[in-house]
Each structure stands twice: as structure tokens, then as C-alpha cells.
């Protein structure tokens, strides 16, 4: 289990409160699909993913990205119990979707980049470290069923 300090929790929740989940979620998933094109195989029913502009403009990518980032909201509400929070999603991604758990880590790293671009100077080294810790812990929780 990962322990978050009061300062880390404050850094995470402060930024999260300012986040446009719909915009950032679509951008994060879209960038994942562009930068790591092999991840597109999990989204073959999303239509046109033939180019970066097609991916970033794809309404299904944006909608699913919002859904993914909304689940990060659950992580923020339950930072002290991520394994339980993501148990069902871990099972779904492992047993039904067969998603390589490495993809969770990649998406987390993309999310940190999105945060940095959206929040600029507010995204201090301390804030970055707290978010990196969170996305890493979420990736581990999502990959739990694989072990």
C-alpha cells in the first residue's frame, strides 16, 4: 500500500479541483494512442484512428478519455485504498480486455505531461512528484489482478 502525506494529498486535490476532466481526459487518451500506436488495438471500434489529428478529434476517444479520467477522481477520493477502488477495473482489463498492464503506467505518464502543460508554473516539482506517485500507484492497483 502506498502512503500519501497530507502535503501530497493537498497538492493532488488542489490541481484536481481545477481540472477540466472532459478536455484533459480526451487529450490524455488521445496522446497515448498517438505516442504508443500499439495501444490502438484495444480501441478498434472507435472508428478513424489513422492520424494524430483523427485520433485527437475522435469523439469516442474523447468520451472514453473522460471516463478514464473520471475514474482517476475515484483514486483521488480513495488514495488510501487504491487496490480496492480499482479491483473491478483491474479484473475487467485483465480477464475480459486483456490489456497489458504496462499501458496503465504509460497512460499515467501521459497524464502527468498533460497536467504540466495545462497548469504551467502551478505544476511545481513537489506537485509533479505527488502526481507521479499517484499515477504509479493507480497503475499498480489496475495491474493487481494480473499477479
Curated annotation (Swiss-Prot):
Heme b binds at residues 64, 93. Red blood cells. Residues 3-147 form the Globin domain. Belongs to the globin family. Heterotetramer of two alpha chains and two epsilon chains in early embryonic hemoglobin Gower-2; two zeta chains and two epsilon chains in early embryonic hemoglobin Gower-1. The lineage of its organism: Eukaryota, Metazoa, Chordata, Craniata, Vertebrata. InterPro entries: Globin, Globin-like_sf, Globin/Proto, Hemoglobin_b, Hemoglobin_oxygen_transport. Keywords: Heme, Iron, Metal-binding, Oxygen transport, Phosphoprotein, Transport. The gene is HBE1. The modification Phosphoserine is found at residues 14, 51. Transmembrane segments: none annotated. PROSITE patterns: GLOBIN (PS01033). Pfam families: Globin. One of its GO terms (molecular function) is oxygen binding. GO terms for biological process: hydrogen peroxide catabolic process. The keyword Phosphoprotein applies. This is Hemoglobin subunit epsilon. The epsilon chain is a beta-type chain of early mammalian embryonic hemoglobin. GO terms for cellular component: blood microparticle; haptoglobin-hemoglobin complex; hemoglobin complex. It comes from Pithecia irrorata (Gray monk saki).
